[in-house]
Amino acid sequence: MESLRDMVLPPGFGFHPKDTELISHYLKKKIHGQKIEYEIIPEVDIYKHEPWDLPAKCDVPTQDNKWHFFAARDRKYPNGSRSNRATVAGYWKSTGKDRAIKMGKQTIGTKKTLVFHEGRPPTGRRTEWIMHEYYIDERECQACPDMKDAYVLCRITKRNDWIPGNGNELDNSDPHPEPYDAPPSVISTEQLNPAAEPVVGVEAAPVTVAEPDGVTTSAITANIPSPSDDINLDDWLNELFDPFFDPEQSLASADLSPDEQNVESSNVGALAPKVEQDYSSPNENVVDDTEYLLPEDVYNILHPGTDDFNMLQNPLDQYPIQYATDVWSGIQKEELWSPQANAEPSQSNEAADNGIIRRYRSMKTPETSVPQFKGKTQAKMRVGINKMATSSSESINQTIKFENSGRLVEHQKNQAHDVASTKRSDAGKPSTELSSNRGFLRGIRNAFAGCSDARWNMILVAGFAIGVAVVALHIGQRLGLSQRDQQHT
């Protein structure tokens, strides 16, 4: 060993093994207990020494600030898998993702990157010392029962371009730990210069490592560093827990900068619910809308079912209606007749609450006491119809619903039938012939009610042609009979 330490190597010679060589040759033999030629890599308890004291313990002289050591894994817990990486002056903190080392298509080990911090978490100060830990793959240990992962191979690197206080200190106020089950990234075994290896840092700005041959390699910046192994997990989780976290507020302020979010959170008025103005009334400053309603609308709201105030003041039943004597006009007026003298609900009167009353007469009303349905009453009905057509949409909807219920039509038909039967019984002269004539005339009227003038002309022409044909046929028959009589005589 002393010979290697005292040996002066010529320029260009050095110890620059690849990652695959460190695991497959040196670390695997160390775990198997096999002898390594020259024993270039010493065994040192790295976690009990400060990083600046380790270069003196290396047996191979080097000028590239890279030193290799075997270290026994000091478990933080007796039955755990976490290593205790704390020293007297500071601690080694893991950063970046674990990367798989492959030889061909087979994974032979894992590479972990750590950075030394002075002090104690979470106020540790980042330093220029970097360590790469090489682990043998677990499947290699399972394949060989005599193998144990009791050793790791460590490579210590010191960065010469490190400037303390130039944005290199770790921001401990917002740690972003790396989960332990993160999938490792793969490092290819084919590297142009195995000595020029990337260095993973926590800072957003890339860092470079100066090599002796002038080759500089850009650092790979890690987005999610993992917590130090010697940090209490419960304390670290308590620091991450925010009892005032609001997911809706966080989503709403996702697009805002930190300064804008601080202003939003400090503004108490911005958190209060926004009160929208109600523009439902015509005037924004007036709450009551009764001043903007017509008298008809107010009455329709209080007393739904009618739109004519004059008819309410002077009900229609005060003016009994006399039927017309002719059949053609009497049918229409008969259907419109609806007296309202008896408003008591009964089994035969189911619509007493809607203003329609069914009334049965046992005696014939004298003609002298029945005024004609014309004049003032007819004018009032016309005014009511006009008001119904020009009233508010709400009144029109009520009228349409009332008519669509079907009760008015049914009542009108029953009333017309009752009146006709009452008139026949009161007269004491049942006239079947008159009823049949009325039915025949009503059928003819209904058949030709929808005919237009052109259809009437066609009907008249067809009737005239039929009449002429009948007359001609009759004359022909008479002439034929007269000729036969002459022949017989």
Curated annotation (Swiss-Prot):
Annotated TM spans: 456-476
Topology with respect to the bilayer: Single-pass membrane protein
GO BP annotations listed: regulation of DNA-templated transcription; response to unfolded protein
Tissue specificity statement from the Swiss-Prot or TrEMBL entry: Widely expressed.
Domain NAC span(s) in chain numbering: 9-159
Entry GO terms, CC: nucleus; plasma membrane
Location, primary (coarse class): nucleus
Subcellular location: Nucleus; Cell membrane
Entry keywords, A to Z: Activator, Cell membrane, DNA-binding, Membrane, Nucleus, Stress response, Transcription, Transcription regulation, Transmembrane, Transmembrane helix, Unfolded protein response
DNA-binding region(s), residue ranges: 108-165
PROSITE patterns per record: NAC
Region entry Disordered, spans: 413-435
Bias kind Basic and acidic residues: ranges: 413-427
Induction section of the entry: Induced by salt stress. Induced by cold stress. Induced by dithiothreitol- and tunicamycin-induced endoplasmic reticulum (ER) stress response. Induced by heat shock.
InterPro entries on file: NAC-dom, NAC_dom_sf
Disulphide bond pairs: none
Disruption phenotype: No visible phenotype under normal growth conditions, but mutant plants exhibit hypersensitivity to heat stress.
GO molecular function list: DNA binding
Domain comment as written in the entry: The NAC domain includes a DNA binding domain and a dimerization domain.
Name of this chain's protein: NAC domain-containing protein 74
Native source organism of the sequence: Oryza sativa subsp. japonica
